[in-house]
Regions:
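Contiguous segments within soluble domain cores/interaction surfaces
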Residues: 46, 53-83
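Long luminal/extracellular ectodomains of secretory-pathway precursor proteins
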Residues: 72-73, 88, 93-94
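Bacterial signal peptide processing site
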Residues: 18-20
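C-terminal motif of bacterial Sec signal peptides marking the signal peptidase cleavage site
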Residues: 14-16
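Extracellular/periplasmic metallocenter environments
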Residues: 30-31, 35, 40-44, 50-61, ...
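Bacterial N-terminal signal peptides that target proteins for export
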Residues: 1-6
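Proline/serine/threonine-rich low-complexity linkers at boundaries of modular beta-sandwich domains
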Residues: 22-28
């Protein structure tokens, strides 16, 4: 009887150690002056965003999900309003995650479960001329 219990316990342990069937997408992103270089679309599900700053300036990114049928054009209109700087983001912008500021040549990765929908990447840092990287085009849907 004890051999049967030992065999059952071993089988249970092996089953618990089995591989995870969920797939994680790996997506390479590059940040340069002043653009994100990335695929046009990214599959939903668990995704690792592998970011490399290929530029000479500091770069970062914030990942936001857009709700209510909004697009990157709506984000531009919102950010163009001077009042937007003194308010929290609108309810249709859900900041999901981000990576910290990286110097040229540095890399960082971020893993998130991306639900189907529209997302935008933004770099909120300021350029040497005092305008934001977003104003220079570092925003991507």
């Amino acid at each position: 009887m004890s051999k049967l219990i030992l065999l059952a316990a071993t089988m249970l342990l092996l089953a618990a150690c089995g591989g995870n069937d969920s797939k994680t997408n790996a997506v390479e992103l590059r940040g340069d002056e002043y653009a994100f270089v990335m695929p046009e679309t990214i599959e939903s599900g668990w995704t690792t965003l592998e970011f490399t700053n290929t530029g000479g300036e500091l770069h970062e990114f914030a990942l936001a999900k857009l709700g209510g049928g909004r697009t990157v054009a709506d984000v531009h209109r919102y950010l163009a309003d001077p009042k937007s700087q003194q308010q929290p983001p609108p309810s249709w912008v859900q900041i999901r995650a981000g990576i910290p500021t990286l110097e040229g040549g540095e890399e960082a990765a971020l893993t998130q479960e991306l639900e189907p929908g529209r997302y935008v990447l933004l770099c909120f840092l300021d350029a040497p001329d005092g305008t934001s990287h977003i104003e220079h085009g570092m925003i991507r849907e």
